[in-house]
Structures are given as structure tokens and as C-alpha cells.
């Protein structure tokens, strides 16, 4: 038995999209069949049914309503599935035979444009990576905003550098020219850390590209200025990305016309671990925005501004001129309080112009989207006026370049009613007076409805049926309804159409003639209104460059205002940023931690790193604030280099080229690395990639191995860091107090400690950093504060006292203890165990012990002594 024509059509389309879930439009539903149906049923918890397909067995089938399909598609895309949307491409009422269908779009994790599937404050990037031996090209595109960036990596460990770039953009989908097994670290990072869909099966996208097409799209200048040719890795990645977008979206990509090519030298170097440990845009544990630097700095009013601020935080600048340009804009807004407040009020009513334009280009925009765009355009002229008196170069430039788009705004306002319906297919959204032809047809509908009302009244009078009424439905059109109690009074000219419980429905020839006029007018109105809407859409799409430029200006202005607002609210200061090699901070505070303190003030601290004081060797107890102090310094540097004010009473920041952190000791079990191996791997990366202009944080190096090994490695790292080979600005926190002697041995090493005081048995953290080494670590006191049982704390006190008794008089005289010292420590521990056994014997009441109990006590003591050997 052959398959039905519809099923044959389905197979023909499905064969073109074998690795996709095919959403096949049937009436008001998207249906899935066979394996697709089983997958969708499982993933979406849908009922699996069947459909006759011409074969003995029914085809497995499940479906979703087309009007609510987005939520189902979003769930599938989030799990990495690709969705092929197959629509009816002709009106079923006009079709001769089988309705024509074709795939109009493919939705993948990196090609989502639907607002309901996107985070408005975050870009949704698609990435392509082209591997070329020791170099690689990367390209990132957010097709919902038309943002495209590209870069090239040409030296060093490309695996680490690619992961750093991926961490900055966090793409949802990655196209790779190389097999995942060739670069397993990148694949694992993309999959496990980013949750990205990694596709290494589309090698053909990276072959036989068209460089001339790229030059036409983005302009020759961007390629010539960076010496990029047809064979450049970045160009091959870009070409693959554009081809993939065209293949999946099946629309004119004229709106993707601007390329930002960047080099690593433009931005502050931030590796993967540094981004995570500083919690720039998401927290380590909960992966949330709250508790991050972005959370503190984000007082943007627009989705576009929120996305741009995130990008700035992920990519701080290194050019002093570019930083000062931003800084001056923020500073002027801080001083212009009234104008800033008014601009914030204006921006509050701005829509997401970038994503609205994408909907217009994709022909998925409706009347409400057009009014949202109009609302945003109506704000442009007042914004330009508020910027009239601004003198900082950046704000003046934004003002002068801002196109208020009055022609587009006027067109939308004349054409679209203020509160349009959702659908553009059913009419009712074109303003009265915009089109004489539409107005005339609307008048026919209005007059027709008035005529219907008059007919209803006259028929009541003619027939004497008081309850007679005229109604309408899509099946029968207009009809006369009479209850059963009056049906004997119905005149012969009434034609019975439908019998219902309690009433009869009739039609008349006169009613049908008027119905044809009214409904004909309605159909024509719907068609003409849609035609006018398409003209409007095409006009706006033809001005996409102007709208994108205005959106870019508004987003930058929004970020500047946000940074100014945060500076004013949090008592930040404008840092002095220059090309010096010093970091001088007075009364610095942690921007995030201070926001969580409710009943106490954050204790500020100073930083003084310069040519002579290069490495701060920080000692002090756990929980005293060493990690907070080091992180706050890194965040202040980063804030300064995005153009922000900083939490301090004053700050002078010599621009840093790279920022590194080695914080935390959690095992990377998924990668099979122990705490110590992970620590050493990260240290090796830092030492290989840092320069004299870098800033490094080391927190407790060497804890994952034996004391002497750890101490030796920590010392060697310090010595190398302050050597002529590196001499990077560094903060090094340690519990190895023996290392403090390096202040006298190594140029640039300076001892600091976090102050803590004991008041009786109570330990008080003063959170203040001062010159000099800590006199004690207070480890046992910290254990007590942490809630360790008293019995354990007392035991620790005894062990410490015994160790101190057998320790060298001056441990600094020999940084690496001799073996006999270690033996003395072991002997001391054994002596303590014997003393404890003796003490336990003294406490026994032999007069009350039974023989069995005595044997039990003896067994316990024997086990204790054996455990000491």
C-alpha cells in the first residue's frame, strides 16, 4: 500500500533536514511524525498519537498549536535540537490538490530571534572557529541584534586563548572546522562550562568561500585596515558564519552589514579562570547576575544598554585615550544631575530597537512592534535636546550623530493605530485617513452593520416576533434566529438553515446579498491593510542602517548614564588612568561586598604597587579578608579600564594589559585533575603569559601538596614573579609565614598583613591591611568561629603547643626545615599520645570496672598507641 500524497510530501522535505526536528504545518498545528514525534513526545511530555499514512500501521505523530509553538521550540532548542519550520506556502482554499509546503526557517541554539526565547539583557551568540595549525580565526554573531565580531589568534597556546574568547562571548552554538577530538579541551569547555551546542560536522561551510561577497557586505576598508585576505583564518570563520546564517534563516541578510574586527591588544586580557573567580557577570555557585560586578553597575534603562554594559565588562580597554574618552562622558553626566535624570526618564520608554529591526527584516513584526518602534523614535528628538549642552567629546559626538528618524516615525504614526491587534492578517490596524480605498471599504462594513441593525428592527415589527435577532458566525454567515415559541409566525420567505435546541436559524436572500457586500469589503480591507503594512515594513527595512546607528547611540548613552548613576549613588571617584606602571588606591572598597553589608561599614584599604614595591606578600588568618582585598583591587582596576568611576577616595591606575587570578582549590574532577595539579597548571599559564604590565593575584599557592613542597613552590613563584624576567604587579596571599623573609631577600617584595586581635578567647577581625608580617595565623580561633566542636579545638590547642615546643627557635633561619626537625615533630606527637593514655589510666575507677569493661579500655588504649606508629 503506497503512502498518501501528504506523507510523500513530508518525506521529501524531511530528507532535506535529516538531523532536524521537522515542524510540519497542518492547519492550526505543527505536526511531527515517526522518530521526530517520538523525540518531541519524550522531550516535551506530549501525547504520542498516530495518523493514517497509507501503510498498514499508523505513523507515530504528535503536535503543538502553531500560535503557542514558540514555548515548545524554546524548550527543544535549549536542549540542543535544531528545528526546521515547514509552513503552508499557499492558501488551502485556493490550492489545487495538495497544499504546497516548504521550510521557511531553521531555528538552532545560536540562531534564535524570537523575543520570548531570548534574555533581553544578554546577547545570543553564534560562533564559528576556523583552525589553521598554530593559528585560528573566530567569529561571533548575534543575529537578533546584527552584531558581528571577529578576531584572529596567531601565537602561543591557541587552546587557552580560544577558551578565553569563548568565555567572553559565551556563544550558544559553535561551528568548528576541526573535529572535537582534535581539540578536546575546547570541546569540553564549550559543552560543560558554557553549555554550548558544538557542531563539528559542517566542514563544507569553511570551504570555497566568497571573499568578494564579504567585502561587499561589510566594506573593503575593514579588511584592508587589518591586512585580512581571502585565506585569513578570521575571514574563513566569518564566511562560514554568514553562509550558515543564510542557510538557516532564508531571509535577506542586508541588515547584517557591520563587522567589528578586534585584536587581543585592544582589550584587557582575562582568561577563563579570572572571569569566573572575579564573578564579573555571573556568580560561581548559582550562575546568577545578583552578586556580580554587572549587578552593581547595571542601572541601564534599555535592553540594548544592558547588553552593551555586559560586553564592556567582559572586554575592558587598554588604550588610555579610549578609556579617558569614556571616563569624560561619565564624569560630565555625574556633574549634570538634572539632565541625567531627564535622560533616564526618556530612556525608560525606549524599546529594543535592535531586535525590533530584526523582526521587521524577518517579516515577523506586527502592528504592536511598529508602535513600539514609533515610541522609541519619538524619544530621539528630546534625547538630542537634553544633550545640547554637553561638551565632553564622546557625548558631543553621540548628540551630533544622532538621527531622530522623523520620517520613519511620521510614517508609522500616520499608518498604524495606537492600539493595533496582534495579527496583521485580519485588518483593523491601519489609521483612518491613511488610505482612501481602505476608508471606503470600512464605510461599507460600518454601513452594512447599521443596515443589519435596521433590518433586525424592521423584521421584528413585520413578523411580530419580539425576540427575533440577527447573528453571525463564520460557518453560516449572517442569520435570523427565532425561538421555538415563535416559529409558527415565521414568514415563508425565511429559509431554514439550522435547528438548535430551543430555536431555529433562518436566512433570507436580502440578508445574503448584504452579507456578500460586507464580507467582501472585509476581505478586501484585510488584503489592502496587509499590503500597506508590507510597504511600511519595506521602507523601514530599507533604512536599517539609520535605525541601527540610532540604536547604537542610545545603547552607549544608556551605559554612560548607568555608570554615572552608580557613581553618584555609591560615592565612587573618578580614577586617574595613565600609562604609568603603578596602582595606587586610597580607601578602596569591594564594589559587590559592600552592597551586602547592612549593619556594618565596609572597611576600606589602600594599595601601593609601584616600581619598587612590586609584590605584596599578604599574611593573616582565614576569614580576615585577604581574598576580598585582592579581588577588590582587581575589580577596581577592571572598572577603571571600562571607563567607570571606582569605589575609593582616590585612585591612580596605570593601565594593565592582562589580569590573572589563581584563587580557590576545588578539584576539577571532570577533567581528572587534582587540586594541586589544577593549581600548578593555572600557575604555569600565568607565568608563561604574564608581562611586566600585568596584575596577578595568587591566593594560597601550594596547599594541595606537602608543606615543604608547597612552600618551596610558592617561594620559587614569588622569586620568578619579581625577577627581571617578569616583574609583574602581584598580590600573593599565603599561610607560609616563613616566606615573609623574602622581603629582605628579593627586590620588590613587601610584607603586609590583615590585622586581627584577640580579646580573651574571642578573635576580632579588623579587616585592615597594614605593613609587616602577621605574628600569628589564628587558625584554631578561626576553627572555633566556624563551629568546630570544642573537643576538637582543645585537641588542636594541645597539638599546636607540642609542635611549638619542638619547633626551631627561629624558623626564619632555615626556610626549608631539615629532616631531623620533622622527626622531632613526629616524636612530639607520639609523646603526646602516651601522655594522653597515662591521663586516661589515672581517671579509671578500677573498683567499679568489670573484667569485660577493663579489657575493653585496654583494647582502646592499645589501638591509640598503635595508631601513633
Segments the model singles out, each with a brief description of its role:
Residues 1-332, 345-348, 352-361, 365-457, ...:
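Charged catalytic and DNA/RNA-contacting regions of genome-maintenance
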Residues 34-37, 231, 301-302, 309-312, ...:
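ATPase nucleotide-binding head domains, primarily ABC-like/P-loop NTPase cores
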Residues 1-2, 8-12, 19, 537, ...:
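Conserved phosphate-binding elements of NTP-dependent enzyme cores
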Amino acid at each position: 500500500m503506497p503512502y498518501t500524497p501528504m506523507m510523500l510530501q513530508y518525506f521529501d522535505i524531511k530528507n532535506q533536514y535529516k538531523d532536524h526536528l521537522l515542524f510540519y504545518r497542518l492547519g492550526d498545528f505543527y505536526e511531527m511524525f515517526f522518530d521526530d514525534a517520538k523525540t518531541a513526545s519524550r522531550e516535551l511530555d506530549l501525547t504520542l498519537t498516530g495518523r493514517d499514512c497509507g501503510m498498514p500501521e499508523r505513523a507515530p505523530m504528535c503536535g503543538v498549536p502553531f500560535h503557542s509553538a514558540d514555548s515548545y521550540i524554546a524548550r527543544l532548542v535549549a536542549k540542543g535540537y535544531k528545528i526546521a519550520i515547514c509552513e503552508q506556502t499557499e492558501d488551502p482554499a485556493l490550492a489545487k490538490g495538495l497544499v504546497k509546503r516548504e521550510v521557511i526557517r531553521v531555528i538552532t541554539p545560536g540562531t534564535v530571534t524570537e523575543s520570548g526565547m531570548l534574555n533581553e539583557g544578554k546577547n545570543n551568540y553564534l560562533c564559528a572557529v576556523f583552525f589553521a595549525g598554530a593559528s585560528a580565526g573566530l567569529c561571533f554573531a548575534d543575529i537578533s541584534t546584527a552584531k558581528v565580531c571577529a578576531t584572529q589568534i596567531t601565537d602561543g597556546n591557541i587552546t587557552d586563548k580560544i577558551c578565553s574568547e569563548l568565555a567572553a562571548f559565551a556563544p550558544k552554538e559553535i561551528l568548528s572546522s576541526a573535529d572535537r577530538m582534535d581539540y578536546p579541551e575546547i570541546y569540553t569547555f564549550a559543552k560543560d562550562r558554557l553549555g554550548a551546542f558544538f557542531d563539528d560536522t559542517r566542514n563544507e561551510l569553511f570551504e570555497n568561500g566568497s571573499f568578494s561577497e564579504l567585502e561587499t557586505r561589510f566594506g573593503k576598508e575593514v579588511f584592508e585596515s587589518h591586512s585580512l585576505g581571502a585565506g585569513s583564518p578570521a575571514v574563513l570563520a566569518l564566511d562560514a558564519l554568514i553562509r550558515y546564517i543564510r542557510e538557516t534563516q532564508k531571509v535577506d541578510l542586508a541588515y547584517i552589514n557591520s563587522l567589528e574586527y578586534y585584536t587581543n591588544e585592544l582589550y584587557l586580557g582575562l582568561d577563563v579562570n579570572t572571569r569566573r573567580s572575579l564573578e564579573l557577570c555571573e556568580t560561581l555557585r548559582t550562575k546568577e547576575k545578583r552578586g556580580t560586578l554587572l549587578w552593581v553597575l547595571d542601572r541601564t534603562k534599555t535592553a540594548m544598554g544592558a547588553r552593551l554594559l555586559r560586553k564592556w565588562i567582559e572586554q575592558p580597554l587598554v588604550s588610555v585615550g579610549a578609556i579617558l574618552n569614556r571616563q569624560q562622558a561619565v564624569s560630565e553626566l555625574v556633574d549634570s544631575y538634572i539632565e541625567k535624570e531627564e535622560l533616564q526618564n526618556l530612556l525608560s520608554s525606549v524599546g529594543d530597537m535592535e531586535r525590533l529591526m530584526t523582526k521587521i527584516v524577518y517579516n515577523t513584526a506586527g502592528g504592536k512592534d511598529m508602535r513600539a518602534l514609533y515610541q522609541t523614535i519619538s524619544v530621539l528628538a528630546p534625547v538630542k535636546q537634553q544633550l545640547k549642552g554637553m561638551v565632553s567629546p564622546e557625548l558631543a559626538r553621540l548628540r551630533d550623530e544622532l538621527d531622530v528618524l522623523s520620517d520613519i516615525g511620521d510614517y508609522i504614526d500616520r499608518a498604524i493605530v495606537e492600539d493595533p491587534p496582534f495579527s496583521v492578517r485580519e485588518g483593523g490596524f491601519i489609521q483612518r485617513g491613511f488610505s482612501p480605498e481602505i476608508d471606503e471599504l470600512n464605510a461599507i462594513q460600518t454601513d452594512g452593520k447599521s443596515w443589519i441593525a435596521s433590518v433586525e428592527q424592521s423584521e421584528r415589527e413585520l413578523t411580530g416576533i419580539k425576540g427575533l435577532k440577527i447573528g453571525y458566525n463564520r460557518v453560516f454567515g449572517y442569520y435570523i434566529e427565532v425561538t421555538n415559541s415563535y416559529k409558527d409566525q415565521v414568514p415563508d420567505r425565511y429559509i431554514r438553515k439550522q435547528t438548535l435546541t430551543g430555536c431555529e436559524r433562518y436566512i433570507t436572500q436580502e440578508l445574503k446579498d448584504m452579507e456578500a457586500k460586507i464580507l467582501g469589503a472585509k476581505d478586501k480591507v484585510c488584503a489592502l491593510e496587509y499590503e500597506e503594512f508590507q510597504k511600511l515594513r519595506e521602507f523601514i527595512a530599507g533604512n536599517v542602517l539609520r535605525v541601527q546607528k540610532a540604536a547604537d547611540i542610545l545603547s552607549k548613552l544608556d551605559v554612560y548614564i548607568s555608570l554615572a548613576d552608580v557613581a553618584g549613588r555609591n560615592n565612587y571617584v573618578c580614577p586617574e588612568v595613565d600609562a604609568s606602571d603603578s596602582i595606587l588606591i586610597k580607601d578602596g572598597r569591594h564594589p559587590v561586598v559592600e552592597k551586602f553589608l547592612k549593619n556594618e561599614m565596609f572597611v576600606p584599604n589602600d594599595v601601593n604597587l609601584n616600581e619598587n614595591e612590586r609584590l605584596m606578600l599578604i599574611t593573616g588568618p582565614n576569614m580576615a579578608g585577604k581574598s576580598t582585598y585582592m579581588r577588590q583591587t582587581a575589580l577596581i582596576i577592571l572598572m577603571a579600564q571600562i571607563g567607570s568611576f571606582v569605589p575609593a577616595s582616590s585612585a591612580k591606575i596605570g593601565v594593565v594589559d592582562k589580569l590573572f587570578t589563581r584563587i580557590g582549590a576545588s578539584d576539577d574532577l571532570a577533567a581528572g585533575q587534582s587540586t594541586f595539579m589544577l593549581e600548578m597548571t593555572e600557575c604555569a599559564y600565568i607565568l608563561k603569559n604574564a608581562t611586566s604590565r600585568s596584575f596577578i593575584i595568587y591566593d594560597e599557592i601550594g596547599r594541595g601538596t606537602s608543606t615543604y613542597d608547597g612552600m618551596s613552590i610558592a617561594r620559587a613563584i614569588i622569586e620568578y614573579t619579581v625577577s627581571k624576567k617578569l616583574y609583574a604587579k602581584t598580590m600573593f596571599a599565603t599561610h607560609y609565614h616563613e616566606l615573609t623573609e623574602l622581603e629582605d631577600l628579593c627586590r620588590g617584595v613587601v610584607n603586609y598583613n590583615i590585622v586581627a586581635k584577640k580579646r580573651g578567647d574571642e578573635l576580632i577581625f579588623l579587616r585592615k591591611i597594614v605593613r609587616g608580617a602577621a605574628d600569628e595565623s589564628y587558625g584554631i580561633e578561626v576553627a572555633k568561629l566556624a563551629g568546630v566542636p570544642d573537643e576538637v579545638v582543645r585537641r588542636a590547642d594541645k597539638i599546636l603547643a607540642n609542635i611549638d615546643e619542638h619547633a626551631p627557635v627561629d624558623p626564619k633561619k632555615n626556610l626549608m626545615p631539615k629532616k631531623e626537625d620533622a622527626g622531632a615533630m613526629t616524636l612530639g606527637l607520639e609523646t603526646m599520645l602516651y601522655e594522653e593514655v597515662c591521663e586516661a589510666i589515672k581517671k579509671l575507677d578500677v573498683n567499679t570496672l568489670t573484667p569485660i569493661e577493663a579489657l575493653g579500655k585496654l583494647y582502646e588504649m592499645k589501638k591509640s598507641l598503635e595508631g601513633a606508629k
